[in-house]
Amino acid sequence: MVAEAGWREVARRRLESEEFDLLVVGGGATGAAIARDAATRGLQVALCERGDFASQTSSQSSKLIHGGLRYLQHGAFHLVLESLAERNRLLETAPHLCRPKEFLYPAYAGRFPSPMLLALGVGLYDALALWRPPVRSRRLDSREVHRLVPWLRSAGMLGAQQYVDCQTDDARLVLENLLDAGTVGAVAVSQVEIQPDHRSSGNFRVAQATDRDRGDQFEIRARLLVNATGPFCDSFSGGPPKLRPTVGVHLVVDGDRLPTLGRAVVVHSPRDGRLLFVLPVGCRTIIGTTETDWPGPGDPARPPRPEDAIRAYRRDVDYLLETANHAFPPADLQPKDVITTFAGLRPLMDRGRATRAAASREHAIWSDASGWLHVAGGKLTTMRSMAEEVVDRAIEILRERGRQGAVRPCQTRARPLPGAGETIQMGTLKGFAPPFGPPPTPTPRSLPPSGTSGPAPSPPHPLAALAPSRSASPNPPAMVRGELSSPAPHATSLGSLDLAPDITAHLTETYGARVGQVLSLVASEASLGRRLDPDLPYLAAELVFAIRSDLACEVEDVLRRRVPLALFSRTHGLDVAEETANLLARERGWSEQRRAQSLLQYRAAVSASGMWQAD
């Protein structure tokens, strides 16, 4: 296997040699969406992330694209309306990453919510979604609920409401935003840390950057600096705290120990009434999430920092198991049934609400005298619309600072993500090579008048995601193999390989139209077609693809966020960690010391996910 040109080396050279309109700090959902929105408008964009892309909050979510049914009880109608609009948009622009899932929300005698209140809430939810697909909700009686999910508590059940929201791969959703940004000239680099302090040089801000991979320092020149560091916004900005960060913990158990027969179930904790989800993901089930205030180590008032350890504690595991066992009495889950845990911080806005549940999921955008534009709050589902607002504000600031040149109105409302934007012909799925090559030549267009963002694109036809829509883009993608209207070289048909049904489903749902590149690896080297875990559909080829095309730089990047054995395998991917480290060493030219370091870091991360057992 011969490595392609190293994307990171190309990107690093661009960071040092070019001048940018925006430097986005933070490679999670918010930062990735901002980079994509700005780049597709014609701005020159750089993004730096101190760890891996989506390595913090954005890969520790419940992995849902949803309107937030429970937010209705707090009167957050605008947030639910916006979230449902974005959910429906993702169903069209990223159908492989926004997969409809039936949810059952049972009602019980003497418990909140009552059947009538639940029916009203779900009906309002449908109305705020404008009664658009996937499907409308319906009421089920207790007998039908028992037939659909036999293990669900039947005592006192008064029926249930069935509604539909969507599941996603949160880390991959972030990744595809970055990949798309790269096709229109953005440059994004992981393991690059930016310091809050900077200096001015004419119309540019000069930021100090540390390459945590290479160990050296350099400067990046940009007209505007954007702080998109999520829950670390307060510690990065150094200003008055604006966030009320909370910790959310999830458990992963075997699907046979907590079977929901393919449906997600909404449950309430018997201890405090908090709403949680029981979510089937392949042959596993996710239980979550908790919500506890951030306990700054030694200083409860201190904002969290990226180096802080965010993990599950025994109290979290006990709480989630208690909730699951109350909702599913036959399960009788024990701590030994927990395959793994994952935990993350939510960047909730501090609006002075009395409870964590009522804390705002909305976002805030503000600038300061030092030259930074800050964004905080929000949720995974609304990452695109939040980014649109940020870029609108950024353009206003750039105008105030005398920036001239071509900027288009927002392009992301109907623009497919990479896995959805190619033609599917004769069972052949095509994809993209690594991004972040030389930026494309922009097509000039007049800057819209101040205070406007230009006309919104018309909503696409429901099948638009299968059309070669990228060919209509004013900017040709950078570093794309071949023409978008013709099959990519070596693209391989799903039907030409003898793959198990679960593997076929996994590959198409994960990579969408990019799956041809993964299949090409299997076709070229048979050993890459083997399963990495007997219970799971992951292939060895995906390890190679993660390193070459999906921007992975460390063993943990590969096995936690690209091929998530760390979350779903009983061995946590430790049995293929050595193989992954060897691949990285070969592809990236590592020394033995560097290879061992990456392997050690991954083993430590796996160990941290099980530290609750020693509490």
Labelled PLM ranges:
Residues K63-L148, L276:
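Dinucleotide-binding Rossmann-like beta1-alpha1 core, especially the glycine-rich loop
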Residues V10, E19, G51, L97, ...:
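C-terminal accessory subdomains/tails of enzymes that are appended
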Residues N227-P240:
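Flavin (primarily FAD) binding-site architecture
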Residues G27-G28, R50:
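Glycine-rich Rossmann-fold phosphate-binding loop(s) that bind the pyrophosphate
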Residues M1-L22, D37-R41:
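Extreme N-terminal leader/targeting segments of oxidoreductases
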Residues S190-R205:
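A conserved short coil-to-beta-strand element within the FAD-binding core of flavoproteins
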Residues A39-S59:
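Glycine-rich FAD pyrophosphate-binding loop
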Residues E18-F20, R214-L224:
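Core beta-strand elements of the Rossmann-like FAD/NAD(P) dinucleotide-binding domain
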